[in-house]
Structure formats: structure tokens, C-alpha cells
Amino acid sequence: MDNQLFFKSLIATLPKWIHKCQTSKHENILYTNPNSLFQLLYFLKYHTNTRFKVLIDICGVDYPSRKRRFEVVYNLLSIDYNTRIRILTSVDEITPICSVVSIFPSAGWWERETWDMFGVYFSNHPDLRRILTDYGFEGHPLRKDFPLSGYVEVRYDDSEKRVVSEPIEMTQEFRYFDFASPWEQMSRSDESNQK
């Protein structure tokens, strides 16, 4: 499948659903908004010219400096055309994404994992609950603002003969993270010095 022709036909067919298309390292990437995601994935699965019938994975990425800090990534495979495509959408902490379990039944566990690790809420999910962390776990551990030590210490108490959870005392309640790389600024100044 020719990437340029494929993208042109997709943009012509779905101009409201696709914000941007790009090919990076032989990977096809589409950007869409959360409101159009369900319709776009339905189209990509069932249309004759696409047939992306296999959902390979759903994952999340946290970019705290962005207004829509969470990027949710859907990786699809078309066995008929031997092609892969990546669909990206971005949401903030309170905007839900429509669940795609009704299109791809395998999405159930991946959406649960993304919710458990990042806190991205999937509306209309049949069973949205934690999948990797404990039932009483507080927070979402793959967020960049989640403390490395966590909020509680879980250990086995030999005197009580059971597992106990105790809150960790934080010396620092809130930390500000500067995610800008100091190396980027140095490389820019080196380039200007060479000119």
C-alpha cells in the first residue's frame, strides 16, 4: 500500500476525523481528536480499502507540560494489506475517551491498563477497574507526577503475621518537575557559537 496515496485518500474521505498524517521510520501515523476516535477506528476496521482488523495494542504516554497531557496510542494491523498504522489522540485529565471494546473486544484489558496506570477514563467500558495494581491502590503509577516511592509502604509484619500498609512520610509534599532538557539548550548555544 503506497503511503502517500493511502493518506491522501483517507484525508479526502475523512477530513473531519483526521488532523494530521505522517510517516516516520516506515510507520504510518494518524492524529485524531477523542470525539472522532470511535468512528475512525470503526471505519479503519470495516472499510474495504483499509481492513485494519487486528488491534495490536493500546498504550498511554504522559506529557505533563502539554495542555492535553495524555496521549493514547492505538496500534492496528491489516493482515489483508500487510500494513500497520498508529492512531494517536490526546486528552486532559478529565476528558473521557469512548471505549472501543465493541469494535475490538481485545481492547478491554488494554483500556483497563491505560486507566490503571495513567488515569485516562474510557466511557462505555463494560468493566473499567484496576488490572495491574491492588484494589485499594491510590493514584496512577505511570504519571510523571507520581512519587517514585509511592504513597504507602506494603510489607509483611512478622509480629502481626499479615501484610500491612503504612503511609510513607514525605519530606516534600509537592515537587515541581522541569522536563526541559538542559542538553538541548547547550547544543543550541554550541551551534550559534560555531557560526
From Swiss-Prot:
It is an enzyme of class 7 (translocase). GO terms for molecular function: NADH dehydrogenase (ubiquinone) activity. Keywords: Electron transport, Membrane, Mitochondrion, Mitochondrion inner membrane, NAD, Oxidoreductase, Respiratory chain, Translocase, Transport, Ubiquinone. It catalyses: a ubiquinone + NADH + 5 H(+)(in) = a ubiquinol + NAD(+) + 4 H(+)(out). Complex I is composed of about 45 different subunits. This is a component of the iron-sulfur (IP) fragment of the enzyme. Core subunit of the mitochondrial membrane respiratory chain NADH dehydrogenase (Complex I) that is believed to belong to the minimal assembly required for catalysis. Complex I functions in the transfer of electrons from NADH to the respiratory chain. The immediate electron acceptor for the enzyme is believed to be ubiquinone. It comes from Marchantia polymorpha. It is found in: Mitochondrion inner membrane. This is NADH dehydrogenase [ubiquinone] iron-sulfur protein 3. Belongs to the complex I 30 kDa subunit family. Its EC number is 7.1.1.2. The lineage of its organism: Eukaryota, Viridiplantae, Streptophyta, Embryophyta, Marchantiophyta. It comes from the Eukaryota. One of its GO terms (cellular component) is mitochondrial inner membrane.
